Amino acid sequence: MEVTQTKAEGLSRTFAVKVPVSELQAKLDARIEEIRPQMRLKGFRPGKVPAAHVRKMYGRDLMGEVIDKLVNETNQKALEENSLRPAGTPNVDMQADIEKVVTGKEDLSYQMHVDVMPEFTPVDVSTLTIVRPVAEIADEQIDEALKRIADQNMKYEPRAEGEASQDGDAVIVDFVGKIDGEAFEGGTAEQQSVVLGANRFIPGFEEQLLGVKAGEEKELNVSFPEDYPAANLAGKAAVFETKIHEVRAPQTPEMDDEFAKGLGLESLEQLRGLVKDQLANEHTTASRSKAKRDLLDKLDAAHDFDLPPGMVDQEFEQIWQQLQREMDAGRVSDEEKAKPEETLRDEYRKIAERRVRLGLVLAEVGRIADVRISEAEVNQALIREARQYPGQEREVVQFFQKNPNAMAQLRAPIYEDKVVDHILETAKVEEKTVTREELFAEDEE
């Protein structure tokens, strides 16, 4: 066997590998002898099938096994002998005629292409200064949260006879939608509650129910939006024939002890305490997220080294595919969609490079600090993942147990969080008082 490094550019390596026919045949003979004792063929005693017969019947398949195993072993040996850490699975470019190799007429020769991990020394995280924003919880914020709870528990009471509907009212209505005089599927309902101003119906529907009274009938002239999900309705004008059964006015409950008791609590004071605790948890989560972002920015600025091209390409493809899905779903801003594709690709490749760089830095910091994940932590994450698929929990768990790549993806964010926690515990952390709005403002990638 001959293994020769033929290329070393940046983090890319190429090895030329050649295995003579004689070595392949020797390994095939060894494989045949390995399986002969277990073979059962008609006309032969158990375990006594002649090697020549086994070669004749199964030689082709067995040689395929030999080649696959030999390629894997050779690749691993080449990396170990050259003290290289692969940044992904090596790519094999077969140079020989594989048909001739399998039949023993030609040496096995191929090229192995592999990206290797960069060598770098991470910054001493104890020298970093991380800014952690904090915000006080004001009584006004608690009051706003309580108001949202009250709104969620709002009840609607019938308006007085002859009283017209107003914005915010719930109108109980029957309707039949028609296009060109023909009723269409999904356009009919009875005793439907329509909250005016909630914008849950197509534009113009709720607005035209303002001022109606119980017992009235009214035609609503509307047009479906051009981007309406049902393609057969998109952009078309429609008429909804409606019959008003009842007009109900919203009644916001009083925020007092009785309201709290209705929620299973003892008093309004206890409810305020629970709301404050919830807000505190939200602040803690947002504060850590901001501190993590500052930490990642500082790590990114402190490191400059070559990145494995394959890792960057893979990360970019994932980001790009996600962007395409977001565009298809209409969740991308007009400003973003207006950019030339080349500009977008440049921007998102920089994001991919940042993610790969930070992933490598965090992994090295974690290795040096001996950060580890416990099986209990992995199991908890697995349970959380399984619970997202009610009724299929067992199948989800089995999927992860049988798929190392999926399990690695499950472990990755757990490990990252533990490394981030380690850095936040080691670095100097300065608290900065900000407003709640600043604390929850979204960061750009």
Swiss-Prot record:
PROSITE patterns: FKBP_PPIASE
Major site of localization recorded for this protein: cytoplasm
Domain PPIase FKBP-type: 168-253
Keyword Membrane set for record: no
SUPFAM superfamilies linked to this entry: FKBP-like, Triger factor/SurA peptide-binding domain-like, Trigger factor ribosome-binding domain
Keyword Transmembrane helix attributed: no
InterPro entries: PPIase_dom_sf, PPIase_FKBP_dom, Trig_fac, Trigger_fac_C, Trigger_fac_C_sf, Trigger_fac_ribosome-bd_bac, Trigger_fac_ribosome-bd_sf, Trigger_fact/SurA_dom_sf
GO biological process: 'de novo' cotranslational protein folding; cell division; chaperone-mediated protein folding; protein transport; protein unfolding
Pfam families with a match to the protein in the record: FKBP_C, Trigger_C, Trigger_N
Keyword entries, A-Z: Cell cycle, Cell division, Chaperone, Cytoplasm, Isomerase, Rotamase
Catalytic reactions of this protein: [protein]-peptidylproline (omega=180) = [protein]-peptidylproline (omega=0)
Entry GO MF terms: peptidyl-prolyl cis-trans isomerase activity; protein folding chaperone; ribosome binding
Localization, UniProt: Cytoplasm
Listed EC numbers: 5.2.1.8
Gene Ontology CC terms: cytoplasm
Primary role: Involved in protein export. Acts as a chaperone by maintaining the newly synthesized protein in an open conformation. Functions as a peptidyl-prolyl cis-trans isomerase.
Family: Belongs to the FKBP-type PPIase family. Tig subfamily.
NCBIfam families documented for this protein: tig (TIGR00115)
Domain notes: Consists of 3 domains; the N-terminus binds the ribosome, the middle domain has PPIase activity, while the C-terminus has intrinsic chaperone activity on its own.
Name this polypeptide is given: Trigger factor
